[in-house]
A protein has these predicted regions:
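Central antiparallel beta-sheet cores of small beta-barrel/beta-sandwich binding domains
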Residues: 56-62, 136-189
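Structural detector for short beta-strands of small beta-barrel domains
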Residues: 29-49, 90
């Protein structure tokens, strides 16, 4: 009987010692926070640029919810390696170095995810071009190393590698190769002149002509740092 009581006391003491350790481990987890920024997902690799401070984080997604949200946000014309605007709940596990390894975001939940536009992106860009008949748009961003072309007419997207433009007078010309098919080249000519997209009452300061092979698209453009077009 004495042995039984002694064994019971030992088990109780062990249990009391284990529970605080478990609680302490849980208390060391980073708090859950809300992060707003630009999320990029490509072939299972995901990263996040924080709009609050510009920090670049890798993402760990145990919820497995990012691929579906990301694909939906990119529609109707997904470009390879494009970023989307996202608000997420996550724990930030800090890395070893603020510059080279700022940390990892462990996703808890996706609050929202939507397509990128000139109003919501916080990654620097040079031009945003758009046209109608069919509807299309192109974002030009040295920071994202690409020209992202969305053709809503046939619901296709292409990413062209960024290269320095050539400027002459009021004309700026980009020549870029398709990231997925380098034999395909895009030539994009931007001219500083009044432009209308033909459908809305918006007035732009730049006209745009895009050539890919034998196909040509015409439209208007917005330059970063200049006022967003308004109706006359």
């Amino acid at each position: 009987m004495l042995k039984y009581i002694t064994l019971l006391l030992v088990l109780v003491l062990i249990h009391c010692k284990q529970n605080p350790a478990k609680d302490n481990k849980e208390n060391t987890l980073p708090p859950v926070g809300t992060f707003t920024g630009m999320l990029r997902y490509d072939r299972g690799i995901c990263n996040f640029t924080d709009c609050a401070n510009g920090a670049f984080y890798m993402i760990s997604d145990s919820t497995m919810s990012i691929p579906g949200h990301y694909k939906k946000a990119c529609q109707p014309a997904e470009c390879p390696d494009e970023s989307v605007f996202a608000i997420v709940k996550a724990r930030l596990f800090k890395g070893t170095d603020p510059r080279s390894d700022p940390g990892t975001l462990a996703i808890i939940a996706i609050d929202s995810m939507s397509g990128k536009n000139w109003s919501n992106t916080c990654i620097p860009w040079e031009y945003w071009c758009t046209g109608t008949e069919p509807f299309w748009n192109i974002q030009i961003s040295k920071a994202e190393r690409g020209l992202f072309f969305k053709n809503m007419g046939d619901e296709t997207g292409k990413t062209f590698d960024w290269s320095p433009p050539v400027s002459a007078g009021n004309t700026t010309t980009y020549t870029a190769k398709n990231r997925a098919a380098p034999t395909e080249t895009m030539t994009l000519v931007i001219i500083k002149e009044t432009c209308s997209d033909g459908m809305s009452e918006l007035v732009y300061n730049y006209s745009v002509t895009v050539s890919i092979g034998k196909e040509i698209w015409k439209g208007c453009g917005v330059k970063s740092g200049e006022p967003i077009p308004k109706a006359e």
